Amino acid sequence: MTTKTMRAIFTPQALAAAVALGCCAQAQAVAFNIGEIEGTFDSSLSVGASWGMRDADKSLVGTVNGGTGQSSTGDDGRLNFKKGETFSKIVKGIHDLELKYGDTGVFVRGKYWYDFELKDEDREFKPISDKGRKEGAKSSGAQILDAFVYHNYSIADLPGTVRAGKQVVSWGESTFIGNSINSINPIDVSAFRRPGAEIKEGLIPVNMLFGSQGLTDQFTVEGFYQLEWDQTVLDNCGTFFGVDVAADGCNNGYTVGNPAIAPLVPLTTAFGQGIQVTREGVVIPRGGDRDARDSGQWGTALRWLGDDTEYGLYFMNYHSRTPTVGTTTAGLSTLAALPGMVGIANGLAPGSGSGLAQSVMLGRGGYYLEYPEDIRLYGASFSTTLPTGTAWTGEISYRPNAPVQVNTNDLTLALLNPIAGGTASPIATTPGSDNKGYRRKEVTQIQSTLTHFFDQVWGAQRLTLVGEAAVVRVGGLESRSKLRYGRDSVYGQYGFGGDTDGFVTSTSWGYRARAILDYANVIGGINLKPNLSWSHDVAGYGPNGLFNEGAKAISVGVDADYRNTYTASLSYTDFFGGDYNVLEDRDFVALSFGVNF
């Protein structure tokens, strides 16, 4: 259950957004009574599968694994699945229970899943493990999602509601594009990857207090205070969309350098500076995650309903739900041991000392994931209907201290600065120090959405068109010769092969669009919804992967349902375009069947 004001829930704009996101009507929930307690129980069961439709792009695979890319930290998922192979084969269920006594109630939602492909099948390149993973990233599991109590009341005939417990609160008017005002809850990325996924499966409820109170017939104030912090669930390493180094428990995938140094590993151990070398290179050890604290997350909103338009003002203080990557430079003891190791290495294999020194500095360094705290967000939104019947919404958000990820190649090369006279990376470092993976920047984002319904089109009862565009401005960026942000490590360090593009720019923009045709009662009560989705990052490179110039995606699909009870969905998604698009070889087909009761 997503928490919004009652007024917001029933606006045409909210309905249009739900349609655009592909939400379909559920069958009538099972209703029951226990004395004066009213209850409903709603269930969805589904089976599905997904297949990869392209071979791995060699330019996105590291050289140590037969490709031409400058990093191997994204190789596991690419080399685990060939073209045409199944990368997910899943059965899952989700259940909602609501109990009401007068104006007071309890809502609980839970889900479970089992992916036979990831759980039971062997992988060609590297095994996929659930050990140490977040529950949502595992190949099989069960979770309680929402679990809260609520009470509806009136003060002087002005409605109000309070909620306490695990819940989702949605603010703002964003439909497709992230980094918006709607940043209260983290996302379960793994859940959204599964065939047949529903919106409610991928939003992570968080323990919080929420309240909404009408001040007049036109003004409503809302607020929340989170009782805990939680993080976005990332794809498990080795899965089709996963990277090797980010998810919880993926601790040995940050490999760099030349694996040919392996014969000299015993020498490093003898000097008390042992390192780990695999077939992919030197392992940079993962340190403990720097999780955000539970306290200090709160927000307030003021809504004004005019004659034809609803306006909103927002403020939030929250901690990042997505991680930044930082590194830790090897300590003084490692530097002190280097001359002895290098001398012996050169005696054993002339010229090998330099490579050994670099490998030791990398292998005795480390990396960590950090979740920056106390991000401030100021926002404003509007929602209206134009004379044409088109729903028009928009919002602006401003974060004066948003964390922006520093280029990870520069962070890795910073580990070599103590033996390179500070010239390996523009990031200054000292032995034993942390190299913070982000800098705080002013980030402003403006976005707008149009939704229109056309009746009786191409034999369909309705055609729904939704389009959303956004522009992002990042203030205070340094020149690229001083510090770079963003860009995947597979493209190498700044200036490699003369390439100096692809890093975060001060301005970036893109748009998303979706079209849905509704064919009712096509054959024997079966309803069909052919749909087309389009994504285009037009210009610039946004912070933290928001926009990637030239990157495009198209998805063609059809959804079917019978009496709002039995469902089926088939879609094909193609990623293409852009010079720095790591998704361009991740095309896939998804098929699912479900039942709602």
Language-model regions, residue ranges each:
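Short loop/turn motifs that connect adjacent beta-strands in outer-membrane beta-barrel proteins
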Residues: Q28-F41, R54-A56, L97-V106, Y150-R163, ...
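Membrane-embedded beta-strand positions in outer-membrane beta-barrel channels/transporters
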Residues: T40, K92-D96, D146-F148, M208, ...
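Outer-membrane beta-barrel "beta-signal"
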Residues: D585-F597
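Outer membrane beta-barrel
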Residues: K100-N251, G510, A539, F547-K552, ...
